[in-house]
């Protein structure tokens, strides 16, 4: 009998923001109970499957990682309920912007992963710009200090899912460093 494989290191690439876990629970399993999105276990499986398929059949695919910056400070200032509500609203915004063929998951305390199937990098940039514009509108007035940073990458021939996510993560870290 095969068990569920251990979560590889590429799934959660380190949360660059110190997080008070009493404010926001860590996502676990197949579904995230806080946001209603799929969880890190689905992210792990979908990444390998969809990246392999895209490379094998020469199909477009882009992986997007999004980091919510300022959510912990929001919780410290306005309370846990506001922080959790804000994270749920951002999750629902990302979900609304994806198609039924895409995957939108919560993969870390303040991190989301999106697999955009049949989407090249130019189309993914359009997704990112729509999310940058719409996500802040979903937050309560107290969420003014909350910002989203994004990284994205499309697979290169023969590239592993882990390498793809690392490239997207590097782009995310670069954006966060340039703020």
Regions found by a protein language model. Give the residues of each.
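Short, charged, intrinsically disordered terminal tails
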Residues: 24, 169, 173-179
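Conserved long alpha-helical elements within nucleotide-processing catalytic cores of c-di-GMP signaling
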Residues: 32, 37-51, 55-62, 69-95, ...
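Structural motif
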Residues: 61-63, 101-102, 145
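Short catalytic/binding micro-motifs of nucleotide second-messenger systems
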Residues: 96-101, 132-143
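Hydrophobic, well-ordered secondary-structure segments
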Residues: 116-121, 135
């Amino acid at each position: 009998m095969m068990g569920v494989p251990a979560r590889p290191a590429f799934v959660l690439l380190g949360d660059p923001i110190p997080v008070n876990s009493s404010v926001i629970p860590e996502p676990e399993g197949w579904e995230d109970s806080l946001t209603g999105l799929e969880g890190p276990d689905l992210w792990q499986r979908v990444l390998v499957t969809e990246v392999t398929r895209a490379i094998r059949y020469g199909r477009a695919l882009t992986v997007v990682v999004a980091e919510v910056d300022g959510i912990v400070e929001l919780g410290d200032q306005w309370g846990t309920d506001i922080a959790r509500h804000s994270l749920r609203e951002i999750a629902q915004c990302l979900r609304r912007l994806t198609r039924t063929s895409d995957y939108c998951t919560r993969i870390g305390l303040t991190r989301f992963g999106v697999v955009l199937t049949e989407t090249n990098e130019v189309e993914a940039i359009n997704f990112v710009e729509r999310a940058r514009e719409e996500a802040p509108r979903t937050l309560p007035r107290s969420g003014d200090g909350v910002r989203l940073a994004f990284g994205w990458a499309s697979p290169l021939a023969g590239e592993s899912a882990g390498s793809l996510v690392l490239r997207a993560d590097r782009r995310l870290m670069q954006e966060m460093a340039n703020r």
